[in-house]
């Protein structure tokens, strides 16, 4: 993917506008999960080291355009950066210009409060562009949205480039999907086939094997002719599951863990996949299945992981996801993981340092895997050509 990279540019004395993803959870004015801020800090440090006049902005939550409310403010992010040792201030009224001193970071208030942000109003894009000499797109998590701060500004800024985070994300996804080392194994979990159908279709053309988990696996179990009892599955997508299974190596679990109700205290019973009763629900794969899948992962050279294989939030139905998580962690394969539940599992099992690349994007990650063009990346490619 040919985009200009921030790392290659001379930024000395230049006004640099960084679109980051600082959309973090906030409670009582305090940041409760700082992962996205921590991921952005190296970009901010690099811009300062290069002698740039640094502005950074992001969306936060879902504010109403044109109506600023205190709970929509990036102030908690500013407080976090101050505590991390940065010379930083918040600018609320910036669309007509902002003065940035050497060595300081100016955080521009929540972009989604600006009228025209979401619909990519070109006039707003031009106002953002007028603030800078260089626009840096570093928010992979919003790269699938063509908005004024992700697309419009990139059209009109003198130079538009990819920040280190975005560049790393594109490199990692390209490595996993464009020319993967083989065998390539994809793990796709989640509650519904319908929400991951395009992902499954796209991966069926790339992966040597697809491991399915969660409610998705239940639909494949039903497609293989087994009773799934009261399990979450999609009867109308059984023909689709059969077609995918006929054209791709998708191993169906040989054993499962079932319960009588969806609750943390429900007793778990392990049994063969063909022994599920009408009043039971499948909430996890069994030990034999987990070990078989771990063996597949062990032999892989590329692993793409999106979604757990069971209800890992409940201790009784955690083991399948735990075994697979450790198989990925202990594998020599290039591994890339993405999606909220996947990140929660990675944190739960303490394996973050053993995954080659952890994607910061949810929807953008899935759309890239589906083979879709990400608008914010497309405009950077166009600008690189010109």
UniProtKB/Swiss-Prot annotation:
Keyword annotations of the record: ATP-binding, Cytoplasm, Glycolysis, Kinase, Nucleotide-binding, Transferase
Q: What class of enzyme is it?
A: transferase
* A Gene Ontology biological process term: gluconeogenesis
Q: Which residues bind substrate?
A: 21-23, 36, 59-62, 112, 145
Q: Which domain of life is it from?
A: Bacteria
Q: Name one GO molecular function term.
A: ADP binding
Q: Which family does it belong to?
A: Belongs to the phosphoglycerate kinase family.
- Record-given protein name: Phosphoglycerate kinase
| Protein source organism | Haemophilus influenzae (strain PittEE)
């Amino acid at each position: 993917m040919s985009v200009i990279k921030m790392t290659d540019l001379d930024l000395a004395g230049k006004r640099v506008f960084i679109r980051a993803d600082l959309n973090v959870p906030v409670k009582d004015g305090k940041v409760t999960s700082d992962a996205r801020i921590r991921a952005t800090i190296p970009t901010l440090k690099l811009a300062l080291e290069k002698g740039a006049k640094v502005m950074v902005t992001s969306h936060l939550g879902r504010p109403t355009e044109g109506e600023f409310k205190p709970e929509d403010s990036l102030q908690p992010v500013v407080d976090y950066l101050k505590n991390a040792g940065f010379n930083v201030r918040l600018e609320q009224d910036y669309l007509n210009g902002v003065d940035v001193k050497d060595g300081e970071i100016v955080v521009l208030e929540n972009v989604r409060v600006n009228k025209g942000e979401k619909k990519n109003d070109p006039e707003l894009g031009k106002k953002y562009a007028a603030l800078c000499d260089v626009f840096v797109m570093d928010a992979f998590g919003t790269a699938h949205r063509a908005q004024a701060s992700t697309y419009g500004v990139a059209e009109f800024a003198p130079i538009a480039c990819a920040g280190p985070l975005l560049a790393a994300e594109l490199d990692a996804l390209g490595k996993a999907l464009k020319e993967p080392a083989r065998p390539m194994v994809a793990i796709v979990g989640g509650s519904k086939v319908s929400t991951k159908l395009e992902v499954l279709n796209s991966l069926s053309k790339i992966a040597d094997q697809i491991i399915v988990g969660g409610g998705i696996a239940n639909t494949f179990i039903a497609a293989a002719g087994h009773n799934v009892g009261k399990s979450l599955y999609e009867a109308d997508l059984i023909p689709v599951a059969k077609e995918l299974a006929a054209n791709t190596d998708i191993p169906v679990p040989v054993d499962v863990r079932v319960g009588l109700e969806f609750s943390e205290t429900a007793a778990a019973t392990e049994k063969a996949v063909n022994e599920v009763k009408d009043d039971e629900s499948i909430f996890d794969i069994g030990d034999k299945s987990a070990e078989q899948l771990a063996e597949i992962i062990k032999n892989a050279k590329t692993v793409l992981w999106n979604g757990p294989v069971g209800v890992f939030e409940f201790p009784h139905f955690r083991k399948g996801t735990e075994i697979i998580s450790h198989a990925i962690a202990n594998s020599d394969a290039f591994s890339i993981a993405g999606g909220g539940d996947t990140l929660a599992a990675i944190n739960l099992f303490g394996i973050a340092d053993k995954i080659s690349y952890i994607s910061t994007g949810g929807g953008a990650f899935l759309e890239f895997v589906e083979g879709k063009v990400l608008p914010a990346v497309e405009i950077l490619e166009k600008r690189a050509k010109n």
